[in-house]
């Protein structure tokens, strides 16, 4: 049996290899609470474009609320390097079309994986369009999200789009707990 990959160690090695350079990163964010720690951490090493694209959120008013909360967080969070905001389109029809027939699949199953790929594909496309150095997602911070599957999808899309995927498991080293500390009580949902 192969050893399980340690994505946090891979991220540590990538950061150590930057040697003080500040590359650009497209960071897909699922929500403000999950992005709080990730932004605090990665803004030390990257100039970040935060990409909010989550057509799985319903209704549209909730989506807009989350966009506003994401922007508020970016403006209130001290960052070492710049963080800009890039909203993606709200296209819930795409999500429902891709997951049709999977409505009863439990959390952590194939429906989640389809949703991961939909969001990461859009992130890879945006990173390529903006000519950024890397892309990644905040999704791995959640204890409910499968970091191995997220990184597998990210690596596959990196090869397809020619933009390196920044492997990660942000829940490691207390990342999830730190995101709770950084987020107001009303933010304790994880998407």
Q: Model regions: which residues?
A:
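Conserved small/polar residues in nucleotide/adenosyl-binding loops
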Residues: 188-191
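Divalent-metal-activated hydrolytic enzyme cores
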Residues: 173-185
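ATP-dependent adenylation/nucleotidyltransferase module used to activate substrates
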Residues: 4-176
């Amino acid at each position: 049996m192969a050893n399980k990959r340690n994505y946090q160690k891979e991220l540590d090695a990538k950061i150590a290899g930057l040697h003080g350079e500040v590359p650009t990163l497209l960071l897909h964010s699922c929500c403000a609470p999950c992005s709080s720690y990730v932004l605090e951490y990665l803004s030390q090493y990257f100039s970040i474009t935060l990409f909010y694209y989550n057509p799985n959120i319903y209704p549209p008013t909730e989506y807009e609320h989350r966009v506003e909360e994401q922007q508020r967080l970016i403006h209130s969070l001290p960052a070492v390097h710049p963080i800009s905001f890039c909203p993606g389109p709200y296209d819930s029809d795409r999500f429902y079309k891709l997951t049709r027939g999977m409505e009863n699949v439990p959390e952590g199953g194939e429906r989640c994986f389809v949703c991961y790929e939909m969001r990461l594909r859009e992130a890879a496309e945006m990173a390529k369009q903006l000519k950024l150095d890397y892309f990644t997602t905040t999704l791995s911070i959640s204890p409910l999200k499968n970091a191995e599957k997220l990184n597998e999808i990210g690596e596959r899309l990196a090869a397809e789009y020619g933009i390196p995927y920044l492997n990660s498991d942000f829940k490691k080293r207390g990342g999830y707990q730190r995101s709770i500390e950084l987020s107001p009580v009303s933010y304790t949902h994880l998407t």
